[in-house]
């Protein structure tokens, strides 16, 4: 298990403008997208056990209902529809071979959803698409060659010379990792404009319930579909580009002896999910040490003096971090809002939260 910390400066705030430094990477635009289809978390247990032909598992269903009720998730967007599931019944069992079915859907839907977010970011940016020099694409599922980065290049009509990087199966830490990678690319390639796209369709983990693998219920409760795109570059051109955030530094820390507590494996049945009950505890016990290492060089030790873009791996993690660090309730409001409205969006989640922080900052400035 690893934690990633990216220090961002809100360039709308008067205080932050002191830190605008030539050559540092800046976020120039953000765009997000979700599938039109969505599910209500309160009624989802009924739908889930009906569509998977598992209504006879009454105790299991009630347990799932309790998990959903405690999740602080109101709704989730999904590519999966009842019609699609009825056409592909092998997706609704726990362990039927279904990888081919999943792949056929994912290799099409992941780039398409990514395009929606990218087009929104490009519109906000306001510059010609031909000025994009680099593309970094990230997704947890749908491994294929040519990859989703290549497909998106065609969908957007990017230059054939655009420098592409495809990152598969990096999980929830990938959102912050993409910021770190894009920062390095922008700061080491003068004039670069890096398009980062995180597109997640969690069809890969959808499956029927299992009495032997109860953490599968957590996956069925938690994950949603969505894509987010950002454009990053240095030295924005006055009057042509508007910086939203500045990326000051990035750090990543591995928590020892935790690799067995959170695992996803590709199998014939799709992507299996294992999460031990100790994960929130590991995070809350180690979060402050990670923050000290990241922020000490900048003289920051008051965790309420900074703004937060916390990946909400689950409600227990959000509450644990808040309590451990003594954070004021408003510090993690954006994380809670995104979790409530979309669920855990894996790599795209922190970018959705970053956009929420941007919207609130802009509103406060006005």
UniProtKB/Swiss-Prot annotation:
The active site is at 172. It comes from the Eukaryota. GO terms for biological process: flavonoid biosynthetic process; polyketide biosynthetic process. Its EC number is 2.3.1.74. Keywords: Acyltransferase, Flavonoid biosynthesis, Transferase. Pfam families: Chal_sti_synt_C, Chal_sti_synt_N. One of its GO terms (molecular function) is naringenin-chalcone synthase activity. It catalyses: (E)-4-coumaroyl-CoA + 3 malonyl-CoA + 3 H(+) = 2',4,4',6'-tetrahydroxychalcone + 3 CO2 + 4 CoA. InterPro entries: Chalcone/stilbene_synt_C, Chalcone/stilbene_synt_N, Chalcone/stilbene_synthase_AS, Polyketide_synthase_type-III, Thiolase-like. Pathway: Secondary metabolite biosynthesis; flavonoid biosynthesis. Belongs to the thiolase-like superfamily. Chalcone/stilbene synthases family. The primary product of this enzyme is 4,2',4',6'-tetrahydroxychalcone (also termed naringenin-chalcone or chalcone) which can under specific conditions spontaneously isomerize into naringenin. This is Chalcone synthase B. It comes from Ipomoea trifida. The lineage of its organism: Eukaryota, Viridiplantae, Streptophyta, Embryophyta, Tracheophyta.
